[in-house]
Amino acid sequence: MAGSTHTVTNQPPPLLGHDVYGTDQALVAAVERHLDPELLDEARGELSALGRAAGSAQLQEWAVQANENPPRLRTHDRYGHRIDEVDFHPAWHRLLGKGVGAGLTAAWTRPGGHVRRAAGFLVWTQVEAGNGCPLSMTHAAVPALRTDPELAAEWVPRLTSTIYERELRPAGQKAGALFGMGMTEKQGGSDVRANTTSARPLAEAGTYVLTGHKWFCSAPMSDGFLVLAQAPEGLTCFLVPRVLEDGTRNRFLLQRLKEKLGNRSNASAEVEFDGTWARRVGEEGRGVRTIIDMVAATRLDCVLGSAGLMRAAVAQAVHHCAYREAFGGRLLDQPLMRNVLADLALESEAATVLGLRLAAACDDGGEQERALLRIAVPAAKYWVTKRCTPVVVEAAECLGGNGYVEESGMPRLVRESPLNSVWEGAGNVQALDVLRALRREPQALNAFLQEVGRARGADHRLDAAIKDLLTELADLDGAQARARRIAERFALVLQGSLLVRFAPPEVADAFCASRLGGDGGGAFGTLPHTLDLRALVERARPLA
């Protein structure tokens, strides 16, 4: 009852108490497909436990608290001493501890680790996307650190630990550590070769002093950072610890925290280096080459993060429409709403399937799979992150006015949705990276064609899309102006090939018709009415 004025009816129950992993049929199928059979029992148990935690009222409340109480910068203590600390709400630390404890930075430590971790990361993004940032950077720092055996021995066991220690202490005193990275500067943005931060060698081999700044430095309370700076031989990668071996704070000077559209639980800082101690990682002048694997890993996490946000939004929309009645029946049963939900579910599943396939390529590690990643990761990062915002906004509209209210959780998803398209290089950077791979690494295109070729002959619309892509690539003159179109086609063809091979026929048919065959519109809810829309929606229901 609501006082004596009316009875509250026709309001869907909150979507809580369910297994976020186990109720996601597309994600479960992808994990089962890519993991070796002997790994499945353990992975099922771990992912279901994480999924149940993610769907719990407690963790969802922590997510709200972490976003309603954003981080706060403290540059000095009460005596005027420089401390450069960021205070987070306790809910942030609880969530981050859960994420680290679930192995979301430990993909490198066990067989099938990338697929297992990718599924977990996709689930975890649906709880609170902000703490995905330090989890992602910590996970991604491992391959860069492994270029230096001494640094790897010191740091990698701590980065891949399942222990979260929030206190800033020397690395040698910690069982677990988090990592960040800093590349962007005011004058350059994505053009890191324009960086002006300088590195002056010290007497001890491999050590330097940095002078300069970074314009965006997320998760600034991490234990260490990989940064790019100009050494005597050119742009070089460095490790900057927050705390030095003797326990003193490094000169890591936090200037202010960014006021951001979304990602409010996570701190993104402007930082200055003034006599900042650093260790070189890799050779001088090879900074981009050293850090490139870290960038590739975080770009894949942008794909997974966007897939997670889409799944969260679609699950809320389908759940709402399964309970809400209007015009004589459930919204779920209204033909037009069913079309909208089916279209959204299709986009969500395509993103999930693509993200898990790329994670499986990371587990494989062979030359063929690495070549595939070289072209597929930037294409996927370009396309999936671009699709996230329209999916989330349309899903929020399915809730009507309720979806515009903060308590629904949908506004937080909307604010978060554009971020992954900006992180680790915006859309143009990704599209141009696809072109770079085509020109410099012909084996990447060969690996891609071999991958999508496994589905040839199964659907005429997919076959035609592959042919059209090859026609597009036949002449790369003026390709820069077509780079987005090319990247989009790469992503769609790869998604289509995976769905044709592995998804239920109704899913593959709908994707090929609307995304490859031209039988769809510019907005969601324009699928051909002859498709099995009910099956698509039922597959997406987050059944408790």
Predicted regions and their residues:
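Extended, charge-enriched "interface" segments that sit outside catalytic cores
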Residues: 1-110, 544
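Internal helix-loop-helix
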Residues: 81-170, 217-219, 416, 423
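A short, Trp-centered hydrophobic/proline-enriched beta-strand micro-motif
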Residues: 174-184
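A short core secondary-structure module
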Residues: 207-251
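A glycine-rich, basic-preceded beta-loop-alpha segment at the flavin cofactor/substrate interface
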Residues: 246-248, 255, 270-298, 315-332, ...
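C-terminal helix-coil-helix/basic helical segment that borders enzyme active sites and/or dimer interfaces
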Residues: 349-381, 396-397, 470-483, 487
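Extended amphipathic alpha-helical segments with heptad-repeat/coiled-coil character used for oligomerization
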Residues: 370-371, 382, 386-424
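C-terminal amphipathic alpha-helical interaction region
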Residues: 441, 451-544
